[in-house]
Amino acid sequence: RAVPMASFPTLVRNIPTYQMVPDEAVELIHDESMKILEEVGCEFRDDEAISMWKAAGADVTGTRVRIDRALLMSLVAKVPPEFTLNARNPGRTVKVGGKNTIFVPMYGAPYVRGLDGERRYGSLADLNNLHKLAYMSPALHSSSSIICEPMEIPVPKRHLHIIHSALKHSDKPFMGIVTSKERAEDVVKMAGIVFGDDYVKDNTVVVSITNCNSPLVWDATMLDAMKVYARHNQPLILAPFALCGASTSASAVGAV
């Protein structure tokens, strides 16, 4: 007889998050960040994104966008403090944000290391096994997507195999692909096959990570993918591609 699969619920923190620096230092970092966006600005290398910033009231010169802090904070205030990330199995649906904590496998490794210690490029078989392990682990709330890159699959269709593996071998929430507009659209279509197109329109079913390029550049590839997911009401994690000691300061505070 099959053993029921255990799955931990979303963890809710009842203690404060770790504070690396005093509140005064956090405020100083925030103020300096606002000055950079107001005075230096950020490059948005996409015509539609530029038009959106103009319509929102930002100061736009060519592809350089300077954003007033009041405008920026008013836009940030529209982001919900938490949201529900729906799984194919409703019993594995989780809450993201607020005091909630979820655990997700890593994303984007080109290599895997076997039990024999050999380090090699990842394969589709490796990815399938990693998705199965993520599904079987009660402490993981998601199967991610690109736990490792299946390097033998040609890049133009690799994303299809990655998402198929995540959906086939796990019924936990999964993550999207952001390497092109077309691939993001394919992810949304595959989610529609699993959840139903109407359900996807009204519910969050996939979360994706996009990275700006240091220093201060959003390129067309990332912006195109962001627009696809946003127009389908799917959440995004916007993160800097910060490499401590390379593209940022080596210290945690300096990198922030």
Question: Where on the chain are the PLM-derived regions?
Answer:
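Acidic/polar, glycine-rich intrinsically disordered N-terminal extensions of enzymes
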Residues: 1-126
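Helix-rich catalytic cores of soluble enzyme domains
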Residues: 122-256
